Design a protein with these regions (language model features):
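Short alpha-helical transmembrane segments in multi-pass integral membrane proteins
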Residues: 1-30, 88-155, 197-253, 309-376, ...
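Residue-level signal for short hydrophobic patches within transmembrane helices
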Residues: 19, 23-42, 46, 69-76, ...
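Interfacial/gating helices of multi-pass transporter permease domains
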Residues: 28, 51-71, 137-142, 202-203, ...
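Transmembrane helical elements of multi-pass membrane transporters/channels
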Residues: 28-47, 149, 160, 183, ...
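Helix-terminus/linker motif at the lipid-water interface of multi-pass membrane proteins
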Residues: 38, 42-61, 130-137, 193-200, ...
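Short runs within selected transmembrane alpha-helices of multi-pass transporters and secretion channels
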Residues: 81, 150-168, 176-184, 205-218, ...
Length: 457
């Protein structure tokens, strides 16, 4: 059964990624994802301001102390959800309604099991892990109180990301944006209520996060019942089909592990940076906050690429995959040129704006980080989109290998180069690693027998 384009309305804006102009469709599909990234970053800033201004530095430090653990939990959960959504997008592209509903049913089952395992492991190991990370005694209990609430809310976080991923899988990137905005606004309101009015402290921030995502899950499910019934499985679709369940499990674990390894690499690099002094850390922190905004066009397009390639892989359109990837690579070059111009004109001013510092060391190091990184945005865009494309076509090991390269590369820089070349080595660490990762991924892409069938042996 072939999927017909969905009738468009204000709340049902499915983008057809399998027919018509390629880049136009990709760009339209990507825009809500880009706004979602921007909104999430702005929300994170507001959330930090609320905790810092109402509860003070100690509470802010408590949340910061478990930041790496939070990223691991969230990254792994999002990775699992994205992996499951990739399989759903393939079924949608193939026009197989039954397969799509079986995929949704299997995703629900695997998601519940994975969430239970993560929650139980967290309940047993989070406190010892915080102690292992040498969390200061004065903030240890607050940090644990926050992260354990997040841990018990993993099932809600997973459901939230799975719902958004499944809607994107059928070409709807608009409604996930709506749900994200609602969740973020509600989270800010609940933060103020729980923290300022009820005096719940750091735990209030965790409860606010879980409740706001829970409300968004409920709204998303209601939307699916009303406007996206294609995603509603019936009882018969919960029958376990070993091949499908293995595909769902392996795809989700591959992406979950990839996110976790990337987060672990960031922790390793931060260890190297922490030995360079307070002013260097301040400059790097400001530069990374700016980087988080400037690389959004690349991460958003990579996310759109995942759905695009998955659908066209399912629809058996290798030519559209090739042409789409070419357009995405060119888009990355445009982003890089824009970043070079932007950083060459105002990098130091932007670092000063974000950091509020007038220290030359802070401003010079932060600006140098931005200027040196900008030309490599084209490489980063190629890396992200190629990795997502390979995962979308069923490749699991090779994209994961790229994350291992990143992790090992950061260990090498921390041990060998940062002690000798200090912050210059920090700046060059990721661009150099991006180049090695991209080479590995492009070789894998060029040898993919679906995209380049002539190379199939």
């Amino acid at each position: 059964m072939t999927q017909s384009p969905a009738k468009k309305s204000f709340f049902n804006r499915n983008v057809d990624l399998m027919n018509g102009p390629i880049f136009k469709s990709l760009f339209i599909f990507m825009l809500p994802i880009l706004v979602s990234c921007l909104f999430q970053q702005l929300y994170n800033t507001v959330d930090t301001m609320i905790v810092g201004n109402v509860l003070g530095d100690t509470a802010l430090a408590a949340i910061g102390a478990c930041g790496a653990i939070y990223e691991l939990l969230v990254g792994f959960g999002i990775g699992i959800g994205n992996g499951l959504a990739i399989v759903a997008a393939r079924a949608y592209g193939a026009g197989d309604d039954d397969q799509l509903k079986q995929t949704v049913a299997g995703s629900i089952v695997i998601g519940i099991i994975a969430s239970a395992v993560i929650t139980l492991a967290g309940a047993a190991g989070l406190h010892p892990l915080l102690e292992l990370l040498d969390t200061p005694a004065e903030i240890l209990e607050d940090a644990y109180g926050y992260i354990i609430i997040i841990d018990f809310g993993v099932i809600v976080m997973f459901a939230y990301n799975l719902c958004a991923g499944l809607l994107r899988a059928i070409g709807n990137s608009f409604m996930p944006l709506v749900f994200l905005i609602l969740s973020s606004v509600l989270n800010v309101i609940l933060d103020l209520w729980f923290i300022a009015a009820l005096g719940m402290g750091v735990a209030g921030a965790g409860v606010a996060t879980v409740i706001s995502q829970g409300v968004s899950v409920a709204l998303c499910i209601l939307y699916v019942f009303r406007s996206a019934r294609l995603l509603l499985p019936e009882k018969k679709h919960f029958h376990v089909e070993s091949r499908l369940y293995w595909e769902l499990f392996s795809q989700s674990i591959s992406m979950g592990l990839m996110s976790s390894i990337v987060s672990a690499g960031s922790v390793v690099l931060q260890y190297g940076i922490n030995g360079l002094g307070t002013l260097v850390i301040a400059g790097h922190t400001a530069a990374r906050k700016l980087f988080a905004f400037t690389d959004m066009p690349l991460t958003a397009m990579a996310s759109a690429c995942s759905t695009y390639v998955s659908q066209n892989y399912g629809a058996n359109h290798p030519d559209r995959v090739r042409r789409g990837m070419r357009d995405i690579y060119l888009y990355g070059v445009v982003v890089a040129v824009t970043a070079i111009l932007l950083m060459s004109m105002g990098a130091e001013w932007m670092v000063k704006l974000v950091s509020g510092s007038s220290e030359p060391v802070v401003l010079e190091n932060g600006a140098r980080y931005l200027v040196w990184n900008a030309p490599f945005y084209a490489v980063l865009g190629m890396l992200l989109s190629t990795r997502y494309a390979l995962q979308s076509m069923g490749e699991k090991v090779l994209p994961l290998l790229s994350s291992v390269i990143e992790f090992l590369g950061k260990i090498v820089f921390v041990l060998l180069f940062i002690p000798r070349f200090e912050y210059n080595a920090v700046i060059l660490c990721e661009p150099v690693i991006w180049c090695f990762m991209t080479i590995e991924l492009l070789i894998a892409y060029r040898h993919n027998s679906f995209v380049f069938p002539k190379m199939k042996k």
